[in-house]
């Protein structure tokens, strides 16, 4: 039906007869001439109808936005004064000789001249996706997956599919369950990841595996989370953690070079402990120059319990954040930041405003200065490298609250004051995570997943001191986003059972949920390691949007609903009966 795409016409096509198919993006009626901007997935081209083709001109008078049409015409160069430098096709136009209206469009529920609500965009997603910026994002996503496949193929990885209907295993979130009609009362689970299957593929001898795969997690949603999402899933045998990172870093550098024309360079490597200490986050945004500075040792003897308490507590921390130029902040802004850190558990926000260091105590403004002597204040200013015009904020509490609150404050202030260089790319690897973390109920939970290997520990050493274990795990972070994470896996049955035991999974439950894995570990399992990237998040970064729904064709809302299809919906009672399922309705509160 077409000979060319609208958006691909150039001066090289001048004089050629072309047939185009697409939609009316805009129509301008000048009486004797009608101009339309005609759009397809590749872009927009100007088409005009003149009186010499009376039939086409008459039909063109009926055109409205989003009519689906076919046009045949001749490509012509525009006059110099009519060239549109803002359009890729702006040097040419098409003189139409014939027009076919394939399908007309009703009054549109979306307004192309105004910003539409996200609810409307999701309800009429098929119209929203016609917008050039949305089409470009999905084209970029397709380019990314194509680049990934070629790269992985060139590096000897095999694309192997793993099951969608599988067994429920604890991986940190709730499973989406699928009832079995054949096996009454039993359920499959949709995979949260192909984790165990890709490990089993390594045990099967496939050495290098990858898959671009859908994953499902029934968890509370955030702006950058979806109940179904796509991973670039990777697993290798006989490769160390640094070797895995090297190949995966090469992949990401390749993507940025091909999609953005940017060489990311070598990625720095930082331990989890260093990231938390310097940035209050295990996914630091290195475009932001501010760092946290520990000052607890300077405050142990002060008569100010807010500082002295955490300073003398082994589980406490007092950290300072120097804000260059922050002395210009108003009292209202400071109060707003004080309320902001309370979201993360902090009780408030102490500060020192540095007006003129040379004047000593008279050169600063601080509600806590009266609790600190001149020597301590000077030591704090020295350690934070404070200069005239700076602001120093303080966080004092247990280590987690200080890291969470001050890390979030660092990001917010960096953005608010323009300190974060948003023109840069700042990738890094974060390694050496704690293997376990407190579950809040006196037990331990895996920080990543229960199949991650400890670093340089035997099973006996791990069992004796699990709280000291460092995981052989690594995350890739770009501009403050965790885009991928992985680890060396446990390849020894005793170690795997030890980890299960630490996590409170008894032997009976181990056999019930992971018997197939424990059996496989008995038969010559190779050392193996892997990683998974979030394709949606990678695409979000590479297309410059901050909304993950912009890079998914048909996403869900934050309530895990599809406004277009109205899923989820009630099931047919007959279908439920065949599955031996009865829906129990909870009584509504009056």
Curated annotation (Swiss-Prot):
Query: What would be one Gene Ontology cellular-component term for the protein?
Result: cytoplasm
Biological processes annotated in GO: aspartyl-tRNA aminoacylation
Kindly report, in one word, the top-level EC class recorded for this enzyme: ligase
Q: Which residues form a coiled coil?
A: none
Q: Does the keyword DNA-binding apply?
A: no
Residue spans crossing the bilayer: none
Subcellular localization(s) per the UniProt record: Cytoplasm
MF terms in GO: aspartate-tRNA ligase activity; ATP binding; nucleic acid binding
EC number, UniProt record: 6.1.1.12
User: What reactions does this protein catalyze?
Assistant: tRNA(Asp) + L-aspartate + ATP = L-aspartyl-tRNA(Asp) + AMP + diphosphate
In UniProt terms, what function does this protein have?
Answer: Catalyzes the attachment of L-aspartate to tRNA(Asp) in a two-step reaction: L-aspartate is first activated by ATP to form Asp-AMP and then transferred to the acceptor end of tRNA(Asp).
Identify this protein by name: Aspartate--tRNA ligase
